[in-house]
């Protein structure tokens, strides 16, 4: 029951919402987390939790960082209404919810955004470290898609903050790889 890993400089502990599904043979549900996680976080005296990406993704091992469904709450833990209930339960306990959001790249799987309309609409190139597509931020359609997506999560699910993952890969074309 101890937090996984060491806390960062702000006292945050890393880890997915459900770090041990294989031990139980199933994932916790949003409803389970509404009780167990909320009570635990409140009892520990924390004011906020940061959840890893909640968008749909095909590979469990990615913890949500290889997103395919930017507008779909992952069904691993339940349905969208149950996610809303979980976030409401956090708020009722005085706990804010910060959600990881992944604008730095997206899953290269065929059923994702890659060549969505038969052309390279969203993608720019493959990220060499992650094997994911980079968004083409020069395109207005891409910027509109991403801004609309952030607003979707803030307005519909009432998350209190967004942590943008992989910002350096959006800012620097060398993907954070040091030149010799």
Q: Which role does the model predict for each range below?
A:
Residues 2-180:
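Substrate-binding/active-site clefts of carbohydrate-active enzymes
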């Amino acid at each position: 029951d101890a937090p996984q890993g060491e806390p960062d400089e702000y006292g945050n502990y890393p880890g997915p919402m459900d770090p041990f599904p294989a031990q139980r043979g199933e994932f916790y549900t949003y409803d389970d987390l509404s009780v167990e996680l909320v009570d635990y976080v409140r009892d520990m005296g924390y004011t906020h939790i940061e959840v890893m990406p909640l968008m749909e993704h095909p590979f469990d091992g990615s913890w949500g960082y290889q997103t395919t469904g930017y507008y779909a709450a992952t069904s691993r833990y339940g349905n969208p209404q149950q996610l809303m209930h979980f976030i409401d339960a956090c708020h009722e306990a005085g706990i804010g919810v910060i959600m990881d959001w992944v604008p730095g790249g997206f899953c290269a799987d065929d059923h994702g955004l890659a060549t969505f309309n038969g052309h390279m609409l969203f993608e720019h190139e493959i990220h060499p470290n992650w094997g994911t597509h980079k968004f083409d931020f020069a395109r207005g359609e891409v910027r509109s898609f991403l801004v609309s997506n952030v607003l979707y999560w803030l307005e519909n699910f009432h998350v209190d903050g967004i942590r943008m993952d992989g910002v350096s890969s959006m800012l620097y074309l060398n993907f954070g790889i040091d030149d010799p």
